[in-house]
């Protein structure tokens, strides 16, 4: 609800597109990077075959796929077969578990089911029930009831033995039984020295009771505990807390640097999630830069890059160990920092040092943008010869330069080469789509159909193929070819089921999915999953914690396991995204999941496609945070609940504390002035837009208002939510359109056009994922 045009996205290359921390945005986007998708993710990947196969086989229907995938690998050994059996057993156990089916229920509602299981026959189900029920009791302040459930559980519940002891100590401490808690923490550190639960025990052992509820530092109970925590668990979030605390407590002394440097170095490597991370990074560079190693500088560069301080990242990467990524980012950072000459030099150095690296192709494309036209053409010609996969884009850039040099014939020849020699490239798709649109605008539908067919046939997976396929259907209808139109619309849904144009195609197939003028009142059947599925990677403890729904504990465990965030595997990145969603880091979690699409190597693409084919991928990409709040107010306002959910997802990525650069606040990005006006309309003066309850109440009222303004036409209502009713009224009066699709194409604000497509595309994804009837229709195609 910003009512202003968004700035265009900044172009970004694959080497830049490591999962990037995005603290806030005018219009956050999980599907699109902050920079161009022409340069895809080139992460150095470690193979992680077995955990991936766990995710692939998330149901009994797909267990057979485990064997198929294993047998396509290079060595299907006896050990592999044993691993396969163990993974299948784990999958089947999770699917059969009654306890794990209670994860999404409120604690009070599941207690009656858990108690008899906890008192029943010995086994994994009883252990899970005892642990879950004990944790619920502790959360409710009933630690006295929790302790009997935990007694002896560590001996049988092997996946979470260390966490059982941690829960025991937590309950004992809550009951003011500190000596007993200390004894249990010490038992935990001795019995499970490598467990992430031990990190939490060490933190508690080093924390004096008087300091637990205060930020004021006091003398630690056991100084060696925190030293052990920092040494043995440097990546654990509690280690980062201790590092910051010790930095704050440093006394000025001659040897301060000897103490501060290792703490700051640890923060640089592992403290990215801490709110004061950037200040610590700046302090490390400013005060101790001369003591940093090339490896340290790579970590510093990564930290600056993730926090979108690209100029500083470029300077840091210039001092890092030379790799294709570090040299590319050094150059790109210099470029982003306005240091054109230095950027050119680093791009050229990248070309000389790593002449065959994928990063070099992207570097040469960027280099051409910085050079005079004649030099740029030479650079592009070099790139075309050496990097065939980037040749289409290089030729397109070459054609633009030739146009600027008043050489239209040469430019035309370059574009012809794109179509003939690089027919499946994104550049070729753009040319064909422009030609199709131009011919359709001139009512030359035969030619438009021909160009659209060429695009869909040559580049069926290109991002333009869904749009081209939809308009192919529309244009064949104009040519009185209903069978061809139906085939085109169905193909869009089959090939691009997640796209906005799949929804538009479903409309033209007469599916009951709600159109622009009916979707407000449309009430779909919503069926949410009752249980979680195994993650593609992670320890047995992590899997168990996640399946139990213990999100924060699982996240802490993952932080201790995931120590290579600069080079995540496909499975690690997906796991990281899912676990972030669990702890409410929704903006970054959605980004991590969606950016898996940027992988480039054949192995990574295969892994991504395997994950993408599972419901858990799409459920992570289109989640239901705040379900009772959002669905409740949607019902109160007589709004389609999935439309409201999709709008919230687009506005804020479900990040309740987000603020835009123009001041829009919260889940539904309500402007303060708009909030004041709404408060007058509904008679509520006591409100806080930062609070989800007030924000969604106000936001849904405004969405209802925009619907009433336009006779419940959701296209105009959603466009008004973004651009303002005045702008939309003006477009309706001025634009020459005969149907809703033409209106969308003519929206003059690029942000609003993209917003409309994203909201309704999101609505369609929620519908196809959570309405069984629609899912069945898609599966039947």
What are the roles of these predicted feature ranges?
Residues 95, 130, 165, 202, ...:
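TPR repeat positional signature
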Residues 48-52, 60-135, 139-141, 147-148, ...:
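N-terminal leader/linker segments that initiate helical-solenoid repeat arrays
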Residues 102, 137, 172, 209, ...:
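Residue at a conserved register position within TPR or TPR-like alpha-solenoid repeats
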Residues 382, 396, 405, 438, ...:
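Catalytic glycan-binding domains that act on GlcNAc-containing polysaccharides
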Residues 117-126, 140, 153-162, 188-200, ...:
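Short solvent-exposed coil/turn linkers within tandem alpha-helical repeat scaffolds
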Residues 106, 141, 176, 213, ...:
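Residue-level detector of the short coil/turn that links helix A to helix B
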